[in-house]
């Protein structure tokens, strides 16, 4: 992880332009994983170093990058599946005032998302007016801290632990645990900017990629291979207070300070999870009819400041 961060910082320092963005929005997680029985969401903060588009030595070849750190607040969800089973058990309770149930779970998501884009400008009038087609290569390293959000009373869960071995095992999985995710993505990308006047431009960026990697949980010592699709849409306004060009012989530079306001939506759908049990690999596609498909999406509004020369 430290080597990855150091490499990203080095690339940023060597770049002729960079932008810092702060964003705030929502994060949603869906699917039959980690005890989820539906969809849960929370507010998130994002911190990004970015350069959307920079031409190489005045050519039509361009590159861009964005490195984003995300931190969510706590997501909570009741364990409805298991509590439904408990409701049935309560029917046999001679003292119906007692309620035996598994408490809700807390989830907190953090992580790094890094993307590099390279491509060719099919339209390149200047740095404020271009249309580029390229390739996205990236990786995502989030992790999910999860734990039960309350300690059940002896009168509630203890009966089921003592009398239902399967439920006892499931309850043990709801202790504090960390789920690490490492994925790689590659796919086509489009990048454009169009000036509205001398100081304001509108820009957009879209990507659709194949994403593959693994999900690992430390508590149950499990590791799942995952395959899916990633998509991202980013639109915004670009503001610069001045645009001047300075020439010294053959050298020409156009230093700028600028600001951005934008909106970014990204989504990762896990189409298949390969679960290896005792040497036998099972595909999660058999769970699709049960609506247990895993997915993540985020919507973020952001503001940024940057420079270029």
Cite the ranges covered by each PLM segment.
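Predominantly the C-terminal beta-signal and adjacent terminal strand-loop region
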Residues: 228-309
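Residues on the lipid-exposed face of transmembrane beta-strands in outer-membrane beta-barrel proteins
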Residues: 49-53, 114-122, 137-139, 186-194, ...
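Outer-membrane beta-barrel translocator domains and adjoining extracellular loop/strand segments
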Residues: 28-39, 73-86, 144-159, 213-225, ...
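Transmembrane beta-barrel strands of outer-membrane/channel proteins
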Residues: 20-26, 65-71, 135-143, 204-212, ...
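Residues that define the transmembrane beta-barrel architecture of outer-membrane proteins
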Residues: 41-47, 108-114, 131, 180-186, ...
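Short loop/turn motifs that connect adjacent beta-strands in outer-membrane beta-barrel proteins
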Residues: 54-63, 122-133, 195-202, 242-259
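Extracellular loop and loop/strand-boundary signature of outer-membrane beta-barrel proteins
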Residues: 32-39, 98-107, 169-178, 215-230, ...
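Short glycine/proline- and aromatic-enriched beta-strand/turn motifs that initiate or cap beta-hairpins
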Residues: 16-80, 293-295, 300, 306-308
């Amino acid at each position: 992880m430290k080597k990855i961060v150091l490499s990203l910082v080095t690339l940023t320092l060597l770049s002729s332009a960079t932008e810092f963005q702060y964003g705030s929005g929502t994060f949603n997680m869906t699917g039959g994983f980690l005890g989820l029985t539906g969809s849960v969401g929370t507010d998130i903060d994002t911190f990004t170093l970015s350069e959307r588009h920079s031409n190489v030595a005045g050519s039509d070849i361009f590159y861009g990058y964005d490195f984003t750190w995300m931190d969510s607040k706590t997501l909570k969800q009741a364990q409805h599946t298991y509590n439904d089973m408990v409701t049935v058990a309560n029917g046999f309770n001679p003292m119906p005032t007692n309620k035996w149930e598994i408490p809700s779970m807390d989830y907190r998501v953090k992580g790094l998302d890094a993307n590099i884009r390279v491509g060719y400008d099919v339209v390149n009038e200047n740095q404020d007016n271009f249309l580029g087609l390229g390739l996205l290569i990236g990786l995502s390293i989030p992790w999910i801290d999860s734990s039960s959000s309350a300690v059940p009373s002896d009168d509630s869960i203890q009966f089921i632990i003592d009398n239902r071995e399967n439920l006892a095992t499931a309850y043990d999985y709801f202790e504090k645990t960390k789920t690490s995710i490492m994925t790689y993505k590659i796919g086509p990308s489009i990048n454009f900017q169009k000036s509205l006047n001398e100081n304001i431009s509108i820009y957009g960026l879209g990507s659709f990629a194949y994403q593959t990697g693994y999900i690992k949980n430390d508590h149950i010592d499990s590791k799942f291979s995952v395959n899916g699709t990633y998509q991202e849409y980013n639109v915004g306004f670009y503001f610069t207070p001045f645009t001047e060009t300075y020439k010294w012989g053959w050298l020409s530079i156009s230093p700028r300070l600028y600001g951005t306001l934008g909106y970014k939506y990204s989504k990762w759908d896990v189409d298949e999870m390969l679960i290896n049990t005792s040497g036998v690999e099972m595909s999660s596609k058999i769970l699709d009819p049960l609506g247990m498909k895993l997915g993540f999406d985020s919507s973020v509004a952001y503001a940024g400041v940057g420079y270029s020369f």
